């Protein structure tokens, strides 16, 4: 994908750390001007997924503030719900600070996500490249 690959793309960022969410948004917008939507609200997230208008979801594995039907929900479970609600193939990139051996593989296997990004992310180019590579597959 070229430098304009994110132009006109809609990316939903689900991240409960405001600083990390801002970093993700700025990095992706600078990489081509795509529209980044921030949300931690599960009904809003599922509405966006069902709309068919998203091009990618960047989803934190360890959500601490998200609830669904009166109970806490994590990013792995939310990923499955997003995939189920989307009317078309919707790439999901999980973001996680869990770096123990096998964590990423387990998250990918149990969530149905398309990729995993290890946090903290110090280089925005790594984030942008992961997003672009998943959009190439869509």
Where is each model-derived feature located?
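Conserved acidic carboxylate
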Residues: 15
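Two-component/phosphorelay signaling modules centered on CheY-like receiver
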Residues: 18-37, 42-43
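Short, flexible coil/linker segments at domain boundaries that flank nucleotide/cofactor-interacting
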Residues: 4-8, 87
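C-terminal output helix
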Residues: 44, 120-131
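Hydrophobic/aromatic residues positioned on beta-strands within the core alpha/beta folds
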Residues: 95-96
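Alpha4 helix (beta4-alpha4-beta5 surface) of REC/receiver domains from two-component response regulators
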Residues: 69-73, 77, 90, 99-117
């Amino acid at each position: 994908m070229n430098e304009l690959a994110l132009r006109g793309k809609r990316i939903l960022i689900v991240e409960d750390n405001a600083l990390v969410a801002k970093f993700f948004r700025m990095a992706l917008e600078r990489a081509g001007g795509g529209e980044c939507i921030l949300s931690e609200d599960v009904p809003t997230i599922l509405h966006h997924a069902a709309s068919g208008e998203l091009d990618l979801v960047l989803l934190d594995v360890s959500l601490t503030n998200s609830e669904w039907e009166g109970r806490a929900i994590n990013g792995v479970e939310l990923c499955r719900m997003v995939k189920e609600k989307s009317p078309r193939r919707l790439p999901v990139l999980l973001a996680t600070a869990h770096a123990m051996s096998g964590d990423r593989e387990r998250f990918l296997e149990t969530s149905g996500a398309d990729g995993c990004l290890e946090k903290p992310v110090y280089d925005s180019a790594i984030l942008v490249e992961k997003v672009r590579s998943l959009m190439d597959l869509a």
